Amino acid sequence: MSAEPSGITLVCFALRREAAPFAKSAAARPRLRTLVTGIGWDNAAREVRAALAAERPRLVLSCGFAGGLNPDLPAGAVLFAADAETGLGPALLAAGARPARFHCARQAACTAASKRAAWAATGADAVEMESQVIHTLCHQQKVPCATVRVILDAASEDLPLDFNLLMTPDQRLDPLKLALTLVKSPAKVRALLRLGSQSRRAAGQLAGVLARALGLEHQGQ
């Protein structure tokens, strides 16, 4: 790993659909790199460790969806927790993001009941599955880091499926398990399509906040 930061800002997402709107707006910015890590601690650790070893960035962002835990926060709210060294706090506030506490879980919180339990246990505003390990790796290398996440599902919402039951051991969605589940419960198809639409809106909202906070809109984006 190089001793000095490269000037690159590394923006990490678990899933391509989370990353797509931001990646499009950042495509012409050579100092902005988008990294899709895969879901969960292990995938994030592997991909971010490799990225840090290849080229030390000046800044790392952990971005994507989160589940709401604080019942006062609606779906679509963009939240952040940033190291002071990032210097991003004022820009994120001005872009419409709210400061928050995140709980980094090993499994998805798919029901309102599980989110209530997580809120009671942690006091966090939102739950996701990658940021803690990303922050830890960055702090080990003295690279400033921030988490910027959009609430996909509010605290009171159940997801249409228990996605934990549909994952492979390496935290990928198993298409066969998904297909079998939908065959058994065809009524879930409509709810899953609604979630897809909701996720596209959320990804766009997150991309807008990131673009404003990182100055892309002032650079012709």
Please place each PLM-identified region on the residue numbering.
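Gly/serine-rich nucleotide phosphate-binding loop at the start of the catalytic core
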Residues: 9-17
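Short boundary motifs at domain starts and secondary-structure transition points
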Residues: 1-4
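Glycine-rich phosphate- or other oxyanion-binding loops that anchor nucleotides, phosphorylated ligands
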Residues: 7, 20-221
